[in-house]
Design a protein with these regions (language model features):
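Hydrophobic h-region of N-terminal signal peptides that target proteins for export
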Residues: 8-17
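Beta-propeller domains with acidic blade repeats across secreted/periplasmic ectodomains
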Residues: 17-423, 431, 439-441, 484
Length: 612
């Protein structure tokens, strides 16, 4: 996504089949209610207007809080990076359950260049470039308890207005995740950190821990990712504004395209998209097909925004676990279906979920709420992504897509008791699961109900036959600090590959696994039959000192069956490269053991390179 994603949409009221002939630009959007009424969705679905101008303008992102309210980031400055403090966060609430907001609070209106908002841990987390802020509001009454606190600065806008840091979403591991475009590389750090102690980040996925206040790159690459979400196994996915459109995000990975990123120059090859298709037709001139019948059939165009893995309980079950993203030029919501492929996934094209008739529709963010319905924000403007001036700042909408008659929900997850929150880990709507997990993490220092929830969750972790239920219990126990290294080590021998995999990741969170754990890693590297386990081991090795990586890497590189996997040879290489660069003896050992042709080539190439 590009933050303005403005689409130079030429008038073709024959929306889906027009030839791309020069036409005058549409000067006005459809009225908000008309725009919702004319959206095409499958039988049984309906689209309603949740909010529109003048109550909302230029919604570049939103999140949903524990009460089901939408906190919306309004990018009034876009694309003027020097426009002053005019961006704001607005809270919208539907108090009577009719599907329309009827209460509006301006939470904060002095932001510089906003691109994301999330709520939790007593306030709002806001990306307002060049700064990443925390705005305290302990009781979430919509009135800040104090001035914004700059957690990090150094986020870039030097190259253009759009490929910037954005987000956010709470991950299953208790970190706050965001995404970042390629051209506006950043040097994030706490205020006052000298440039020499900052690490350049050139785009991809990153995360920030809300308690320890640590920032780290999670994966690098893609072009301009916007939005991150997880499936039920805790595997992350991002959509990409510019071709290709969908990636399975693996910790420590480097993704295509290369684009001469200097910090990844020894990656040599990057992990490709998981999509087996494109949503556009001309790979040499990506805009050439916009508006043609062929492009319409393919999916609408090359630019995407927002990532949602649907895990709600309102839409039909056939949509559960599928990935949805806004298609900017196609004015629609694309739909990809995931299937396992070795250590990762393949994403296949499924019928579009929604098509908008309004030529100003610019979908940005997608998220399902407590009733399982999906909110879609519409930036509502024209122009084609890279424009330097935006005179159409008075519009913006948020729609809601539901199936049948969803049951309205009113409540406050934050006011539930800890035992009730633990029981919500069995809820069919992942919205409740995630919010309850985060609130329990916030209460980790409290003794209130801790013994009871530990008992409940440990019982589910030990005795449930449901992988998803066990993972949910695992993540909560980790978030509240009650998952011991001993228990995680025991899970390395669990019969379920997903429990073994997450045990590997969580044992390496502090980058200090014990010698006994490393021995278990070596056993898994040699003999575990699951490619998912080997993928998690490859990620984990990147978090360890070089000398401690060598035994496990030696075993992984000997797994000849992994040569054709889309992820494993490259992930093995990303963990191996620093060892080869630093230790010639270890490099020789790894080369001798390696049965993967691609990695053998990379080791030899790196050994011949003088630069260290």
């Amino acid at each position: 996504m590009r933050v303005a994603f403005s689409i130079l949409l030429l008038v073709s009221i024959n929306l889906w089949g027009a030839k791309r002939n020069p036409q005058p630009v549409i000067e006005k959007p459809f009225a908000p209610l008309e725009a919702a009424r004319t959206m095409q969705v499958p039988e049984g679905f309906k689209v309603t207007l949740f909010a529109g101008e003048p109550d909302i303008r230029q919604p570049v992102g939103f999140c949903i809080d524990d009460r089901g309210r939408l906190w919306v980031a309004e990018a009034n400055n876009y694309p003027d990076k020097e426009g002053g403090k005019r961006d704001r966060i607005v809270i919208l609430e539907d108090t009577d359950g009719d599907g329309r907001h009827d209460k509006r609070i301006v939470f904060y209106d002095k932001l510089e260049y906003v691109s994301g908002v999330e709520v939790g841990f007593g306030g709002a987390w806001v990306m307002s470039i060049p700064n990443f802020y925390f705005i305290p509001d302990a009781d979430y009454d919509g009135v800040p308890d104090g001035e914004p606190v700059v957690l990090l600065d150094g986020f870039g806008t030097h190259a253009n207005s759009h490929t910037i840091a954005n987000g956010f979403a709470w991950g299953p591991d208790g970190w706050l995740y965001g995404t970042h475009g390629i051209t506006n590389w950043s040097l994030p750090g706490k205020p006052g950190t000298p440039k020499t102690k900052r690490r350049r980040f050139e785009g991809g996925a990153w995360r920030y821990h809300p308690v320890r206040h640590e920032w780290e790159a999670f994966a690098t690459g893609t072009t301009n990712p916007w939005g991150v979400d997880w499936n039920e196994y805790g595997h992350a996915f991002v959509s990409n504004c510019v071709n290709p459109h969908l990636f399975h995000v693996i910790q420590g990975a480097h993704y295509e395209p290369d684009r001469n990123r200097p910090t990844g120059r020894f990656a040599y090859e990057r992990i490709p998209t998981i999509a087996d298709h494109l949503h556009f037709t001309n790979t040499k001139t990506i805009r050439a097909g916009i508006g043609t019948p062929e492009e319409d059939v393919a999916g609408g165009g090359h630019a995407h925004s927002g990532t949602m893995v649907y895990l709600g309980d309102n839409w039909p079950v056939k949509y559960r676990g599928d990935v949805f993203m806004n298609n900017i030029h196609g004015r629609r919501i694309n739909h990809d279906r995931l299937s396992r492929n070795g250590s990762g996934y393949t994403a296949s094209h499924a019928p579009d979920l929604m098509r908008a008739a309004d030529p100003w529709f610019v979908g940005v963010t997608l998220a399902y709420g407590p009733d399982g319905g999906v909110y879609v924000s519409d930036f509502s403007e024209t122009g084609e992504c890279h424009h330097r001036h935006n005179t159409r700042k008075q519009t913006g909408r948020i729609y809601k897509i539901t199936y049948g008659k969803p049951k309205p929900w009113r409540g406050d997850i934050g006011k539930l008791g800890s035992v009730e929150l633990a029981k919500l880990q069995s809820h069919p709507n992942e919205w409740f699961v995630r919010h309850a997990r985060r609130v329990l993490q916030e209460r980790a220092d409290s003794t209130l109900g801790q013994a009871a929830i530990q008992s409940e969750l440990n019982h589910l972790l030990a005795s449930s036959s449901d992988t998803i239920q066990r993972l949910r219990s695992l993540w909560v126990l980790h978030g509240i600090g009650e998952l011991t290294a001993k228990r995680l080590a025991e899970l390395l021998r669990d019969p379920d590959e997903h429990l073994r995999a997450w045990a590997i990741q969580l044992l390496c969170e502090n980058k200090r696994p014990s010698g006994a754990v490393l021995d278990e890693f070596l056993r898994l590297a040699k003999s575990d039959e699951s490619p998912v386990i080997r993928l998690y081991l490859a990620s984990a090795m990147q978090r360890l000192p070089l000398v401690k990586r060598v035994p496990v890497l030696t075993a992984l590189l000997a797994r000849a069956e992994d040569a054709t996997d889309a992820n494993l040879p490259l992930m093995y290489w990303y963990a191996t490269e620093p060892v080869v660069a630093a230790d010639n003896k270890a490099a020789v050992q790894l080369l001798a053991a390696c049965k993967l042709p691609k990695v053998r080539q990379f080791i030899t190439r790196r050994m011949a390179t003088k630069e260290r």
